[in-house]
């Protein structure tokens, strides 16, 4: 069965395109052709134009030890200098970071102030013995000090590893041990849904179970709740940093010196420490901010991601600051104190570029679909989505209600390992298609191929691979070269050479666009027909009573696999829990129209929620285990709400046993 994406195209407005950095598809293809005809020349030009080098690079790309690629060898720079110092001549009094806390507190950091605070933090880190190459684990909430400590590490050449503040002590411990961290920076706690929550006790528990490499712990006081202090190990950041000098010369860093480690989450076994290097990463962070969000000097830009994820690294901290933008940081949740929180912030801060997740969009749509109409959202110029494929109905609501049909949506595909956007529309150039990432960015050779490198025809399932290296790519897995090769360069080849496999499946549509079908382990095989769960879930979302769903496979004696749907009903749903059979028929009617008769749900279970990682990704492996009646062996400690798993297990037993 061939895949299709027959959604209508939405062309960029002529007014927006007129002033965009990339104004039309001709300009886009010109850049693509430049990269194709002179690959190294293309990247050399970008690097010379964008980065303020301390000393020039002598070699653009070193492929001698592929897939351990090296970029811009011989060049020296400092990422904090690129993000802060170089703006002092023209933007020193411009807002660099605007923070709004969960409880409504508010703070503005100009570029000058952010530089001074970064230097003070850098000097404090040095007093604690942190030097170039040392690892610093940051276990923090969404507060300005998190970004400041990241930049301070970059300034002195320390390698930071941010661990999301919602991870368990066990997950934190594993990452500290793997990185060999010398210092941990944390907070007493923060605020969520109007109430304080704690972080420091998790650090205490993690460090009580090993972590011999850790010498000291710095604690940022945020919520002022009582915490335990261990003498000689724990120190209060707020008290010490104010006494430091606001001057700190940036460390001279080689292009390939590591900037940070970021551990991939949600998987079993030892975490993978993804390594990113200084020059290539910051170059692509800046380029994608300028191209994909069409960042201008007047923009107030807001990415709602947590800094604990790669999206927060690249598109809350490093990318916006590298190009001199104003970045918004929000501590809380989108529905506290009500579902208008985000829309009020967009109105109040006059946000022009807004980047969030499909999960958040679906949640706000289901919770209060008319709430955005109470606010003036007219300042919005570009909307963006990240983290998972967005179903067309959520896309349309986002486009109509939030963007007022005038703001293009950049549906971005990328990964922790890629460092920045790979496949995405350009807001002034690319005709948009709901639920479709569209085209690779110039310089990115993303292709849908088979294991031997043959390009797939329209509608055929294939492996989404990147067949040439790029500057911001993963440099390896910390301490495990073999795992790096096995994880990313062992599944596909092109012209006899191993290429990067993303782990995602995809297909080309009739426009030549790439549609992501989801992780290759999120593909079900029904009677020999491979169907992406994202496609099924997008169709299910068209039912007016469905707020969210997750589809997994169960074993079928006849078909091999059949479909099991976990469905979360919208608050305004007319369905009742006794009407599952009726709803099942309605959903299958939709699937028959949207996909075909092969896509038929055999079992349905209404649930109050779905198990998700802290970054909003649905953990389908856990749901598959439940649907098949198997024992759960996956780690659920890193879930947003681990209690929902127990609830679903009970519901499944009551319904099907």
UniProtKB/Swiss-Prot annotation:
Alphabetically ordered keywords of this record: Acetylation, ATP-binding, Ligase, Magnesium, Metal-binding, Nucleotide-binding
Residue numbers binding Mg(2+): 543, 546
Keyword match Acetylation: yes
Substrates-to-products reaction catalysed: acetate + ATP + CoA = acetyl-CoA + AMP + diphosphate
EC number: 6.2.1.1
One GO biological process term: acetyl-CoA biosynthetic process from acetate
Modifications the protein undergoes after translation, according to the UniProt entry: Acetylated. Deacetylation by the SIR2-homolog deacetylase activates the enzyme.
This protein's name: Acetyl-coenzyme A synthetase
Record organism: Campylobacter jejuni subsp. jejuni serotype O:6 (strain 81116 / NCTC 11828)
């Amino acid at each position: 069965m061939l895949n299709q994406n027959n959604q209508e195209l939405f062309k960029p407005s002529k007014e927006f395109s007129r002033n965009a950095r990339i104004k039309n598809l001709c300009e886009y293809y010109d850049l693509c052709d430049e990269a194709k005809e002179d690959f190294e020349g293309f990247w050399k030009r970008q690097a010379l134009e964008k980065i303020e080098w301390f000393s020039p690079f002598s070699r653009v790309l070193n492929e001698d030890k592929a897939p351990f690629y090296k970029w811009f060898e011989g060049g020296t720079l400092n990422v904090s200098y690129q993000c802060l110092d170089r703006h002092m001549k023209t933007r020193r009094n411009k807002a660099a970071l605007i923070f709004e806390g969960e409880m409504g507190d508010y703070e503005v950091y100009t570029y000058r102030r952010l530089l001074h605070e970064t230097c003070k933090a850098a000097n404090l880190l040095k007093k604690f013995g942190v030097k170039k190459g040392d690892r610093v684990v940051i276990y923090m909430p969404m507060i300005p000090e998190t970004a400041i400590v990241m930049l301070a590490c970059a300034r002195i050449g320390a390698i930071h590893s941010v661990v999301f503040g919602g991870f368990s002590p066990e997950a934190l411990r594993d990452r500290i041990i793997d990185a060999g961290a010398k210092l941990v920076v944390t907070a007493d706690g923060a605020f969520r849904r109007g109430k304080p929550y704690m972080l420091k006790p998790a650090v205490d528990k993690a460090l009580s179970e090993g972590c011999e490499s850790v010498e000291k712990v710095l604690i940022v006081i945020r919520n002022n709740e009582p915490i335990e202090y261990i003498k000689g190990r724990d120190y209060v950041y707020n008290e010490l940093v104010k006494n430091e000098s606001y001057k700190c010369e940036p460390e001279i860093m080689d292009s390939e010196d590591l900037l940070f480690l970021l551990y991939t989450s949600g998987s079993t076994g030892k975490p993978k420490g993804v390594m990113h290097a200084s020059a290539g990463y910051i170059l692509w962070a800046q380029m994608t901010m300028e191209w994909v969000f069409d960042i201008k000097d007047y923009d107030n830009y807001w990415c709602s991601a947590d800094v604990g994820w790669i999206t927060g690294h690249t598109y809350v901290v490093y990318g916006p600051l590298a190009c001199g933008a104003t970045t918004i940081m929000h501590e809380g949740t989108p529905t506290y104190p009500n579902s208008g929180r985000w829309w009020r912030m967009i109105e109040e801060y006059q946000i022009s570029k807004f980047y969030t997740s499909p999960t958040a969009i679906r949640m706000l749509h289901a919770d209060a679909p008319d709430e955005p109409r109470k606010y003036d959202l007219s300042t919005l110029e570009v909307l963006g989505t990240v983290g998972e494929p967005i179903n067309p109905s959520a896309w349309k609501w986002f486009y109509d209600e939030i963007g007022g049909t005038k703001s293009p949506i950049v549906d971005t595909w990328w990964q922790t390992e890629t460092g920045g956007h790979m496949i995405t529309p350009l807001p002034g150039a690319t005709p948009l298609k709901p639920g479709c990432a569209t085209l690779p960015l110039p310089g990115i050779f993303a292709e849908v191929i088979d294991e031997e490198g043959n390009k797939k025809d329209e509608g055929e399932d294939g492996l989404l691979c990147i067949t040439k290296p790029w500057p911001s790519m993963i440099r390896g897995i910390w301490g495990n070269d073999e795992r790096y090769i096995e994880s990313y360069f062992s599944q596909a080849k092109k012209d006899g050479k191993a290429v990067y496999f993303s782990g995602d499946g995809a297909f080309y549509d009739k426009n030549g666009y790439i549609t992501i079908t989801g992780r290759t382990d999120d593909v079900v095989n029904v009677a020999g027909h491979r169907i992406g769960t994202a496609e099924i879930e997008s169709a299910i979302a068209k039912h007016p009573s469905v707020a969210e769903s997750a589809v997994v496979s169960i074993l079928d004696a006849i078909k091999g696999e059949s479909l099991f749907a976990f469905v979360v009903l919208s608050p305004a749903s007319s369905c009742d829990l006794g009407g599952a059979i009726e709803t099942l028929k309605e959903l299958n009617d939709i699937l028959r129209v949207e996909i075909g008769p092969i896509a038929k749900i055999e079992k349905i279970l209404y649930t109050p929620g779905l198990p998700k990682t802290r970054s909003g990704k649905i953990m389908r492996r856990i749901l598959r285990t439940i649907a098949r009646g198997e024992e759960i062996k996956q780690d659920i400690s890193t879930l947003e709400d681990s209690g929902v798993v127990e609830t679903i297990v009970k519901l499944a037993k009551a319904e099907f046993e």
